[in-house]
Amino acid sequence: RNLWKPAKPWTGDRPVTREELAQHTSFDDCWVVIRGKVYDFTEWKDHHPGGPFVARIYGGKDATAEFGEYHSRLAERHMEHFCVGPLVGASAERAGDAV
């Protein structure tokens, strides 16, 4: 199985509210915001080179700054199938900066 494609890929077009994001903060159900987009990190966390603990730290939060420090734009493109959709109310600057 391809690590860059979850068992049930997301289409990346479903808007996510902050209230919904707040429901996905656990180790077994972890969504993270990067550049105004919400990603379901749940299935990928065990393969993350930095370790699965990242899910505990950033679940339900915006990890844009931290992501940018350690990842290339290529890494962001690899995550496209994990993208749930845009975060409702995310700043246009952050959302527009996405790949």
Description of each model-found segment:
Residues 1-99:
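Histidine-anchored, small-residue-rich loop motif
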